[in-house]
Amino acid sequence: MPQEIKEVKDFLIKARRKDARAVKIKKNENNTKFKIRCSRYLYTLVVQDKEKAEKLKQSLPPGLQVKEVK
């Protein structure tokens, strides 16, 4: 089931959980979507700022599988 997250802090907390498997990054012209797959939910965070999105991408945990979708 999908669930949207509004805060970057909450997204990073979810990314550090044990059941977090993979992150998909979808880039559009206007925004960047980060979708993290956990055991129960697919959490989505929408970031409008491109610089903020790059910072967030670098701050993801190293053990997490990252896949970029265009």
Curated annotation (Swiss-Prot):
Keyword Transferase annotated: no
Family statement: Belongs to the eukaryotic ribosomal protein eL38 family.
Superkingdom of source: Eukaryota
Keywords from the UniProt entry: Ribonucleoprotein, Ribosomal protein
Family annotation (PANTHER family): 60S RIBOSOMAL PROTEIN L38, LARGE RIBOSOMAL SUBUNIT PROTEIN EL38
Any one GO biological process: protein-RNA complex assembly
UniProt GO molecular function: structural constituent of ribosome
Protein name, UniProt field: Large ribosomal subunit protein eL38
Species of the source: Aedes aegypti
Cellular compartments per GO CC: cytosolic large ribosomal subunit
Gene designation per UniProt: RpL38
